[in-house]
Amino acid sequence: MLKILWTYILFLLFISASARAEKPWYFDAIGLTETTMSLTDKNTPVVVSVVDSGVAFIGGLSDSEFAKFSFTQDGSPFPVKKSEALYIHGTAMASLIASRYGIYGVYPHALISSRRVIPDGVQDSWIRAIESIMSNVFLAPGEEKIINISGGQKGVASASVWTELLSRMGRNNDRLIVAAVGNDGADIRKLSAQQRIWPAAYHPVSSVNKKQDPVIRVAALAQYRKGETPVLHGGGITGSRFGNNWVDIAAPGQNITFLRPDAKTGTGSGTSEATAIVSGVLAAMTSCNPRATATELKRTLLESADKYPSLVDKVTEGRVLNAEKAISMFCKKNYIPVRQGRMSEEL
């Protein structure tokens, strides 16, 4: 039997009691403007799967529920208060993707499918959650095409299972996993296999699997302004992991305000937040063509990224998320709305 390994929680929390209505700093940094968002199709159903600690559909997420599932021993899809960090995490990530007010989500027209895998996940809960998405034949185009994993499973115990799963997902070419690389400031190239975090640890060797790689590995940037040269977020437990050929893209990951399950707000830093922001951009892109292949979406996201020589050793090609370019490039080439009914269910 394979052993469940404890998750890495990839952010630091600073709790705030008041809701914040202003646009977050990173909207300007990555070019997320009203003009950019006008290119998307808000009427096309887009569902992002948040594989995490459960989502509380409150506040700006009140109208964002698509479905909720549990892959935990208690069978509950709701956040539990065993750990403050775990209690908050899933809701926080969902809000960065899709919150409609209070906290501004990157793509507020997206719906969220919550798949709780921690705490107290069943055997290989992360893998089971992804398998359940891949095997769901009732999902329409654009539904759970983007899978946000701002955490993961550490170690080698399930590495072969992960590798088979992700290879199969790549061959299917219809879903993307957006995965956080981790937060201890380590050079991933120097880590042992035991220290790496799945699914970000997936590192295909063959040319076919590389071409079909369904994982987008995300590092976190320190706060910066548009026009400035960004640097990786560092220091403490939230310093971003890095490594050319092990990180696909970097995105804002410091001083990110999110929604908590108690309807208050918090501020966090780390690759968790950066990952959710990338997932939100991909959701916006998907609205323009929900039938697009995973390869098409990933290629556009990476090709449209800004490239900084100062980051080349830490992020492949020095890529930094540019939402304006990614959405514009994809949506001007693709505009095939698919209007489907909304499905909602709970396990």
UniProtKB/Swiss-Prot annotation:
Residues 1-21 form the signal peptide. It is an enzyme of class 3 (hydrolase). Injection of the inactive mutant protein (Ala instead of ser at position 272) in mice has no deleterious effects and elicits an antibody response, suggesting it could be used as a vaccine. The active site is at 52 (charge relay system), 89 (charge relay system), 272 (charge relay system). Its main location: secreted. Coiled coil: none annotated. It is found in: Secreted; Host cytoplasm, Host cytosol; Host endoplasmic reticulum lumen. The catalytic charge relay system lies at the bottom of a deep cleft which probably accounts for its substrate specificity. The C-terminal A2 domain (approximately residues 322-347) penetrates into the central pore of the SubB pentamer, making different contacts with each SubB subunit. Belongs to the peptidase S8 family. The E.coli strain this operon was isolated from causes hemolytic uremic syndrome (HUS) and also encodes Stx, a Shigella-type toxin. This is Subtilase cytotoxin subunit A. It comes from Escherichia coli.
